């Protein structure tokens, strides 16, 4: 989850005119929005490590290690000591995109362990390719190009094939007798990430749940009526796309009302994205009911598609007028008839008058009233600057991310249920003796696994919750999935354990501490820009793919091109398909990548446009050829675990660029003819 734009202006201005500095390093240069880099030649030895930005000193919060993401905190009296084991050129990379800075330290090796064999981009004259396959397929073997379905017989170690006209010059080569998809492997997963609300409306009857309604303007931050039934209706489409895991936005009950959207408060912002959870025991009514969820999960499993829930344990949602009125917490500066006169019969119907913005509703709220706000979550549950609650801290674990209430997941004090739940008659939450906030959250989340057979979680804001909490969630969810599979042997896809991937801003292809605390994969934030550099020449992915294939023999990542928190990747048109789907490790398609879903209305929050409605009219229209291209490559990927899990050997070809991926008995050869 990226910080809500309406609060970005209140956070430290890391990306403004001031620059980062560190003793012994030249001034940092900005490498894309929010990331800063500096290089220096340093001798072996021990030295203090501090960084400075706009007269603020920062230092690593933990032990200093190479190639690991280090959280930064304000400097203490004693700077940490950095031990350099050899002379070399060291790189400091600071990432501020999550609101708190992180640091990555690396050293340039004298000789990179993997060197690309590609010196210049190959050219193609459009004629058939003669490919030496002698090291991959035996003499006399029938080899099929999966894309065009052409078959050639290996003769003198070679085959000749013409890439299909729509393939962008690709040959996807496999043994011709390969006729079914291989057993599923998370290292080769193709995950489709969808904001359910923006995908497909399968049940119009739930469109205005909790009194939510349209704003009559651009509908930037409103619910757009997508739901679980809509997802079920599109499962055949996803199956044809080669998808074998569906990551859906958190379906749990969200705050009912809105907050001001964007830096200018120019639209109402509802929790359509699922990141402002209010009750982890209920489905949000806009998403549907429990029968809808069961149908979705069962129908997906019948098609070989796993279901992942997006989950949040770091924070709750903001206080909204709708929830204050419904659950009787908080306080207003208004009294008596002033309330109805200013806010109306139903407070959530308030709209800004002349000279006001959607932020102006805050002017009516008395955030200092201790008694009123004690009726909200309660001090045992959250820290916030509201009322008499404990103030947020300044570190990753206790900060109030975008001023969202921070859940005390580190607390060892029994908390009871959230205070306002006593006025929430529809909650399924039951008090459990001795339970802390963390205990409740892991119990509630794992119960969805136990009841429905959810296959995994994508964890939001992982770095803002202590690692033992994630291990506890993984342990409980794993036990829950085992129980569900034992009770539902006819519905279980296989015996694979519960899978968990996480978001930690700036994380790349490295085996960090997250992997030792329950995570099976982490989102690879580096891949988007690496792929952007190879849009015009696929061969330029060679070094990246070789390094990933080598490193990922021991762990896994989830790579993406587009996301709701960064941007839509639309460079190169349908060439994005091969850039993503041929990557080692698990990959994530963001809904509409395959159909070039357009950037939507965005107001003063530049991220809102990445969450536009799925462009179904284009899937069978102007984007049909692009969708077909994605389908071909994704289906090929699903047939061959070697693509995601295999080791890579780059080939020296007379024509084009090619590589072999091999995993166990599975072996494929991919050729790109070159630029035309």
Which residues make up each language-model segment?
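Bacterial N-terminal signal peptides
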Residues: 4-13
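Conserved, mostly hydrophobic/aromatic
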Residues: 143, 194, 238, 248, ...
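Active-site-proximal helices and loops of the catalytic beta/alpha 8
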Residues: 116-169, 176, 315, 331, ...
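Short, polar loop/linker segments at the starts of domains and inter-domain junctions
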Residues: 29-31, 151-163, 203-228, 574-577
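Substrate-binding/active-site clefts of carbohydrate-active enzymes
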Residues: 183-189, 199-447, 451-452, 473, ...
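Loop/turn elements at helix/coil->beta-strand transitions in domains of secreted/extracellular proteins
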Residues: 187-192, 239-246, 301-308, 452-457, ...
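Acidic glycine-/aspartate-rich tracts in secreted/extracellular proteins
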Residues: 54-59, 198-199, 640-641, 675
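Insoluble glucan recognition modules
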Residues: 16-152, 165-175, 190-196
């Amino acid at each position: 989850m990226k910080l809500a734009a309406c609060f970005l202006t209140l956070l430290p201005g890391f990306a403004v005119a001031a620059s980062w500095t560190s003793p012994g390093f030249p001034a940092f240069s900005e490498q894309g929005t929010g990331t800063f880099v500096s290089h220096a030649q340093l001798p072996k030895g021990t030295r203090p490590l501090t960084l400075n930005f706009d007269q603020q000193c920062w230092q690593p919060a933990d032990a200093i290690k190479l190639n690991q993401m280090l959280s930064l905190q304000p400097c203490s009296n004693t700077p940490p000591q950095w031990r350099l084991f050899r002379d070399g050129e060291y790189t400091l990379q600071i990432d501020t995109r999550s609101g708190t800075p992180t640091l990555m330290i690396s050293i340039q090796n004298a000789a990179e362990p993997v060197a690309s064999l590609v010196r210049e981009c190959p050219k193609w004259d459009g004629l058939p390719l003669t490919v030496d396959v002698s090291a991959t397929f035996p003499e006399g073997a029938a080899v099929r190009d999966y894309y065009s379905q052409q078959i050639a017989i290996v003769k003198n170690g070679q085959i000749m094939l013409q890439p299909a006209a729509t393939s962008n010059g690709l040959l996807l080569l496999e043994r011709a007798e390969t006729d079914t998809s291989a057993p599923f492997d998370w290292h080769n997963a193709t995950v489709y990430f969808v904001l359910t609300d923006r995908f497909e409306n399968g049940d119009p009857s739930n469109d205005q749940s909790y009194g939510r309604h349209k704003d009559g303007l651009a509908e930037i931050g409103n619910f757009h009526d997508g739901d679980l039934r809509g997802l079920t209706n599109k499962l055949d489409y996803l199956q044809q796309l080669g998808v074998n895991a569906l990551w859906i936005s958190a379906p749990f009950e969200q705050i009912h009302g809105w907050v001001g959207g964007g830096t200018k408060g120019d639209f109402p912002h509802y929790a359509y994205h699922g990141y402002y959870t209010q009750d982890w025991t209920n489905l949000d009514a806009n998403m549907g009911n429990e029968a809808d969820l069961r149908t979705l999960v069962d129908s997906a499993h019948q098609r070989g598609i796993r279901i992942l829930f997006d989950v949040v344990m770091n924070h709750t949602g903001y206080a909204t007028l709708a929830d204050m009125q419904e659950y009787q917490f908080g306080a207003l500066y208004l009294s008596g008839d002033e309330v109805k006169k200013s806010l109306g019969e139903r407070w959530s119907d308030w709209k800004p008058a002349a000279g006001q913005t959607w932020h102006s509703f805050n002017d009516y709220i008395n955030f200092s009233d201790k008694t009123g706000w004690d009726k909200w979550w309660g001090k045992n549950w959250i820290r916030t600057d509201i009322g008499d609650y404990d103030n947020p801290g300044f570190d990753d674990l206790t900060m109030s991310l975008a001023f969202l209430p921070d859940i005390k997941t580190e607390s060892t004090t029994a908390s009871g249920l959230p205070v306002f739940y006593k006025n929430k008659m529809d909650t399924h939450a039951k008090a459990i003796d001795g339970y802390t906030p963390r205990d409740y959250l892991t119990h509630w989340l794992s119960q969805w696994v136990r009841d429905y057979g959810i296959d995994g979680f994508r964890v939001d804001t992982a770095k803002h919750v202590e690692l033992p909490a994630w291990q506890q969630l993984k342990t409980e969810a794993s036990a829950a999935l085992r129980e569900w599979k034992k009770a539902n042997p006819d519905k279980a896809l296989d015996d694979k354990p519960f899978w968990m991937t996480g978001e930690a801003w700036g994380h790349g292809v490295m085996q960090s501490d997250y992997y030792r605390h329950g995570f099976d994969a982490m989102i690879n934030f580096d891949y988007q820009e690496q792929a952007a550099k190879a849009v015009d020449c696929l061969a330029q992915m060679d070094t990246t793919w070789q390094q990933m294939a080598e490193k990922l023999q021991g762990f896994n990542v989830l790579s993406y091109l587009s996301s709701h928190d960064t941007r839509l990747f639309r460079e190169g048109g349908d060439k994005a398909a091969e850039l993503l789907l041929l990557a080692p490790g698990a990959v994530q398609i963001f809904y509409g990548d395959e159909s070039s879903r357009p950037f939507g209305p965005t107001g003063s929050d530049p991220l809102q446009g990445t969450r536009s409605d799925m462009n179904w009219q284009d899937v069978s229209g102007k984007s049909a050829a692009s969708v077909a291209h994605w389908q071909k490559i994704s289906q090929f990927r699903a047939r061959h675990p070697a693509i995601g899990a295999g080791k890579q050997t780059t080939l020296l070809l007379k024509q084009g660029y090619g590589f072999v991926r091999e995993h166990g008995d599975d072996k494929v050869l991919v050729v790109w003819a070159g630029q035309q």
